[in-house]
Amino acid sequence: TEEQIAKIFGQLISGAHVSDHEKWQFKSAMLVYFAHLDHEKGWTQQFHLGALRNNNARLLGSLGPDTGFDSIGDFEQAKPLSKFLNHLDSTNQLAKTILYNLNPGDNELLATMTGNFQDGTIVGKMQFGSSWWFLDQKDGMESQMNALSNMGLLSHFVGMLTDSRSFLSFP
């Protein structure tokens, strides 16, 4: 409820202890809130899924977070993502969405998930975004585009972005 989230927020800003469950509740509420704002504003929401961050505790301690010790994660994504998108869709508040994954084992999962929430209001409303980070290389891009073309429509693909455009220069 809004009251529970307000209470957790109060605890967070006061520095009081917040349980892992309360952190999860707060993060979930914020994610839904921002998704509603994206829909309201007509913005596209983008989710980059699957990064396992700051894996080396020794180097994290000496160099700090986000200094290059990340890897591909193997998180359970299908059920939580489906519940999140379904919640937004069931209230007609699902914004145009692009899903990017970091684990090539999730290609078919995301390619099919995007098909579950197309509604005809916007062509390509749900997109399986281009390969990124560790998959932003020839094999990763081919795997992503093969999954998309096998499970969905390549003609509605949002296209490549950032460094991915350099694939045209590969020998």
Task: Give the location of each predicted region.
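Histidine/acidic residue-rich metal-binding segments in metalloenzymes
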Residues: 1-96, 105-123, 140-159
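Active-site beta-loop-alpha junctions enriched in small/polar residues
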Residues: 50-54, 102-104, 131-135, 165
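Short, contiguous acidic/charged loop-to-helix segments that flank catalytic cores in large enzymes
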Residues: 67-74, 131-136, 167
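Short catalytic-loop micro-motif centered on adjacent basic/acidic residues
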Residues: 96-100, 128
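Active-site neighborhood of phospho(di)ester-bond hydrolases with catalytic His/Asp-centered motifs
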Residues: 129, 160-162
